[in-house]
Structure formats: C-alpha cells, structure tokens
A protein has these predicted regions:
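Glycan-recognition surfaces
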Residues: 312-325, 329, 333-337, 344, ...
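Conserved structural scaffold segments of CAZyme catalytic domains across common CAZy folds
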Residues: 55, 59-317, 340
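Alpha-helix-loop-beta-strand connector modules within alpha/beta enzyme cores
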Residues: 288-301, 383-404
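Substrate-binding/active-site clefts of carbohydrate-active enzymes
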Residues: 284, 288-290, 300-346, 368-380
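Acidic-aromatic substrate-binding/catalytic surfaces of carbohydrate-active enzymes
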Residues: 3-86, 91-95
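Conserved beta-strand positions
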Residues: 270-271, 355, 360-362, 408
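An active-site-proximal structural segment forming one wall of the substrate-binding cleft
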Residues: 248-249, 259, 334-361
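An acidic- and aromatic-residue-enriched active-site/binding cleft used to recognize and process polar
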Residues: 13, 129, 139-141, 273-275, ...
Length: 483
C-alpha cells in the first residue's frame, strides 16, 4: 500500500483500490494487458435502515491488514479426490476497514488473490459498533464500472440456484446474482437480506469470485472455469463411484455392500424409493441403520441416504408451506420452524448412524415466500436470502464439518456440495437400453463443458427405474450386453 492506494497483483491480474471511498481505479488482466475498469467507482454499497450508502457516503478509512486466505467451507480430503493443491488456495488476502460514525457501523472489505490463478475473491462484512440495533437490507459484494472487455470476466458467487449453465449462455459471463446494470457490474442478492444487527453483531455479504480469462477460445475458457472450481471448491473433485440402493432392509444393504466391495464401487446411497427415513428419531431404527452402515465401513464402503428437503408443486403440511401473494401453496419454505426441525432431524440421523453421505433431493432453488406466523423471515422480499442462508449455507457448513459427502441436484458447489446431475430427464430411463446409452452420451458430453466430470452424476438403471419394462433393464447383464 502506498499513498492511499492498495495494489493487489499476482502476475496474472492486478487490482488497484483507493482507500478514500474504497474506489477501484484499475482491474487489469495482465495476461492480455487489458483494463476492465472504465472509471473509478466505489466497489461496494450497503443499504441500512432503508437507505443506500456507497463507500463515498460517510465511510472513513480506518486500517488495512494482511490476513491469511480463509477456509470458507470445512474441508476434509478423501482418497477419491483429485484435488490439485492445498485448500484454501495459497495467495494474498487483505482486509480494508472503514467506519461510518453516523451509522455506528464498521465495514470490512476482504480481497483474496490466489497464486498462479487469475481469480479474485471479494466479500464485504458489516458490524454494528453502536448501541442501537440496525437493519442491513442488502450488501453488494462488488461493484465495477465496466463497458469494455466484459466477455473477458467470469463472475460467480455462492448465492446460487441454478441446476447448471452448461456453458451455452455465457455471453455476459456473469451468473448467480452478478448482473450488469448498463455499465455497472453488481454482485448482490436480487432481493433484500433484511438482517437485524444488535450491538457487536456482524453480517457478511455473499461471496464473489471473479475469473479473468486468458484466451478468446470458448472451450479454453471453460477449461479455465473448471480449473477455478477445482481450486476454490476442491471437494467437487471427489470422484467417488456410488451405487443407488432402493431398499431399506438390513440384508439388502449388506448384500449391496458386498457387491460394491467386490466390483470396486466406493459408496452405497439408500436412494429415492428405498424407504429410508432420515427424519426418524426412533432409537431402535437408528441403531439398525447404524449396524448396517458399520458393516459397510468395515468393507471400506462409504454409506449414505436420501432425503427430500424441497419439492415444487405439491401441497406441504400446514406451517411449512411457501405462500404466493394469492395464498396458494406451491412448495415448502425452508425458513420455518418446521424446516429448522427437519434439518436437525436429518443431521441427527447422520450423527447417530455414522452416515458419510447425504443425497438432498430438491435443495433450495431460490423460490420466494410471503411468510406467516411460523416463518423465520418477514415477507416475500427477504424470504430468498433467509431460506438460502439456513438451508444451504449454514446446513452445508455443518455437514462438511462432519466430512459428509453432499449429492444434490443444484449448483451449490461454493457452499460445499460435491456433485450435481450431469444432465438427465428421468423419463429417459423408460427408453430402450440402446436409446438410454445414446442419451447418456449426449448428456455427458454437454454436461462436462462447464463442469469437471467429478462434479456430475448420471445413472445406469440396472433394474426398471422409471417404467419401460424389460427393454429398459440392463439386468441380467450377460443376456443384455451389447456385441
């Protein structure tokens, strides 16, 4: 830092910030000698008690300090990972601190720049240092004035709801609540956060990751994206081979374990249709599952189970429903008294059975909810943030701290999810064997453009899974193998 200017550089990218007003004056792609920023601009904003403030609206520079890069998700390496380095990635990290005397707020801007990788991480934190409570409506993790070379910048955040982006619509390369407003790039939730801070309490913005491409070639760019995920979310390299078991009997579980151990599969997941109940608190039931899972562990097989967290277009039990403005019930709300109890129940199952994996069907997809008496959010506008925070961020953090593998059909990798679908339609499993193989090859080809192979799962239905009869089955394999 020199004369009020902070410079972060690693030979691939360089970002220069004036501490006065926290204004980014340069964001340069050193691989191509291209400048992205058109004009200096405060690189955050925060809305407090209904009013929006940027870095130039009363925030005074207090200090900056070098800090270690953060382990954002608890990480435990497994034998089936192909992780390419340590986590968190080595690099440089700084925190720039500001005070707003009138609001009695301390604001911290955190930048991380990683060695050998053209990626910058940015997050903003707001702390109440006054006596009165304040409400933080929304925080923009990053704001940049960019009109040229937009296609050289890929922006992702942990505030995610997409199943996949497949690399097919990447004209702006800004996804997951990173959006352009004319010439401004803003990384912020689409709706308000609505977090009340008492004295001494702190809230963090969503986390932005910004990758500067080194090439114009489309497929090479996607290779760079995949390389970024391997470094900032190394759990997504866990390329475990798992078997979906559709039975809950002890004998069937032990038989599946024996078969997996014999052929080299590494995990058994009691899947949809198995009858497993991860919400059960019955001690006798949990002890039976524990004994079956212990048998799997003795054979070197990781064990897990399926749970339905969220589903659209059904009428849930009263109290946990997400409500439209017209009062119609469209799905569960994952910020209710019920959802908190649900998460506790599933976590208890994992703790008491020794499960290594959980298959979360219907992870939160950013649906909105009008709220009600049993809801842990205020209204429609803050429902998205609070559901995401409770059902994704906090829960996944707790699961990863236990070393649990998370199989979930949504793009929650930056919060700890290991794998999502590589692309499929369940009805395809009712097609003839030959057609299933053709369809699967199409999905695997397209689905690995924008994600690493280890980030996606697909199925080979040995038995009838979705209809189709004998022509859709691969068992018996000796009879149905292809010449």
């Amino acid at each position: 830092m020199s004369k009020g200017k902070l410079t972060l550089a690693n030979g691939l990218v360089r970002r220069e910030i004036l501490t006065d007003g926290c204004r980014t004056v340069s964001f340069c792609n050193l691989q191509r000698e291209e400048e992205l920023v058109d004009a200096p601009h405060s690189d955050f904003w925060v809305s407090v008690n209904g009013k929006k403030y940027s870095g130039e609206d009363g925030f005074e520079f207090a200090e900056f300090k070098a800090v270690p890069c953060l382990e954002r998700v608890p990480f435990q390496k497994t034998a089936t990972m192909t992780v390419e380095g340590p986590y968190p990635p080595p690099g440089k990290a700084v925190e720039v601190r500001y005070l707003h005397r009138a609001l009695q707020l301390q604001l911290t801007v955190r930048y991380e720049l990683y060695d050998g990788m053209p990626v910058l991480m940015k997050q903003v934190s707001v702390k109440n240092v006054g006596r009165e409570s304040v409400t933080v409506d929304t925080i923009a993790a990053d704001v940049l004035q960019i009109t040229q070379h937009r296609d050289m910048l890929f922006v992702d955040s942990d505030y995610d709801s997409t199943t996949d982006f497949l690399g097919l619509e990447l004209s702006k390369y800004a996804k997951n609540y990173a959006r352009y407003q004319y010439d401004m790039l803003e990384v912020a939730p689409a709706y308000r956060m609505n977090v009340k801070l008492e004295k001494g309490e702190e809230v963090h913005s969503i986390t932005a990751y910004e990758l500067l491409f080194g090439t114009d070639y489309y497929e090479h760019r996607l290779i760079e994206v995949k390389g970024m995920y391997r470094r900032i979310a190394p759990w997504c390299t866990d390329n475990v081979l798992f078997f979906h078991l559709i039975s809950n009997s002890t004998a069937a579980i032990r038989k599946a374990v024996d078969q997996c151990a014999e052929v080299g599969l590494e995990m058994v997941i009691q899947s949809f249709g198995s009858g497993v109940n991860m919400e059960s608190g019955n001690e006798r039931y949990l002890n039976r599952i524990r004994a079956a899972y212990d048998y799997g562990h003795q054979k070197g097989i990781r064990m897990g189970a399926y749970t339905l967290a969220y589903v659209k277009n059904y009428r849930p039990v009263r109290g946990d429903e997400a409500l439209n403005h017209d009062g119609s019930h469209i799905c569960r709300c994952l910020a209710t008294d019920w959802s908190r109890q649900y998460i506790q129940n599933v976590t208890r199952f994992i703790d008491q059975t020794g499960a290594d994996a959980v298959e979360i069907d219907g992870p939160y997809g950013m649906m909105l909810c009008s709220g009600g008496k049993t809801h842990c959010h205020e209204d429609f506008t803050d429902s998205q943030y609070h559901q995401w925070k409770e059902a994704v961020v906090d829960w996944y953090q707790a699961l990863k701290a236990r070393g649990v593998y998370i199989n979930a059909p949504d793009w929650h990798f930056l919060n700890g999810s290991n794998r999502s679908g590589v692309g499929y339609e369940e009805i395809a499993f009712s097609e003839r064997r030959e057609e299933q193989l053709i369809t699967s090859r199409i999905y695997y080809y397209k689905g690995t453009f924008s994600k690493n192979p280890s980030q996606g799962w697909g199925f080979l239905p040995l038995n009838v899974y979705h209809g189709g009869g004998k022509d859709a089955m691969f068992f018996p394999t000796e009879q149905n193998r292809f010449a």
